[in-house]
Amino acid sequence: MRTFTTLALLSAAVLTAFAQQEPTFRATTQIVSVPTTVTDAQGRLVPNLEQDQFSILDNGKPQQITFFENETQPFTVVVMLDFSGSMTANLEFLRRATEQFLLRMLPQDKGMVGAFSDRIEFSGDFTSDRDDLISALKELQYGNPTRLWDAVDQSIDMLKPVEGRKIVLAFTDGDDTYSKIGFGTVLDHAREQEVMVYAIGLQSEYFNGQRKVRSQPDRSLRKLAEETGGGYFELKTTDELGPTFTRVAQELHSLYTIGFTPSALDGKEHKLDVKMKTPTQTARARKTYVASAARLSNTN
């Protein structure tokens, strides 16, 4: 039986790792790195674009793109799943869909799985072993209340010592009911750590002991995904779970990276806007960055 690490031990491990290894996004080279997803008018991913198809604005001012990459880059992901009481009837559907995501990870990708209810658990260290991740997925336990924001926040914590592209993939079928922190704190934390959040929300029905209740995913998840450059998917049936988890894997392997040198390192939060020259194409990227030399990307 796999032993799941307690929150206290996880926090200690994260702090130790962070002290030993600084993430790429804390290097002092003056490049703002912006992972970007491009879709067409039908929502399909657009591959094989070149640098001249993009433009980027910093506080509304066009910037010269000084770094561009259109090759698949490895990512590190925390897959955090709602295993609260409202999901009891749908847990097997969720596990199978999550397996589809894990099976599509490339050898250089790393991940861990976790679950939240009235407690939060993680599978251990990040690994590229998909079989280990699938085995860990089967051992996650379910509970009752929904600690959504606590779970996402702690997932971001797990990514602190990680270099490169950092992802939280969160799934829920309802509102947060039990967290100690709120949405605003989680958003600030994700921005600070430059973590992309992908969120999948499912509308579902469950029996609360007295009557059938229809749950709705927390509406703030959409804003969290939009602000961090991830994606938000709201589903009406469990049949959509598999294709949606597969779509997220495809997106993560189809990201472009755009970089520019900021004109002023004023330590302030700046607004970012990535635009496409083809009118039928849409770019999705994080909305802000902090113009501080200590918080910009190292492209070496």
Protein language model features and the residues they cover:
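Bacterial N-terminal signal peptides
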Residues: 5-16
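Scaffold/interface architecture of coatomer-like assemblies
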Residues: 18-300
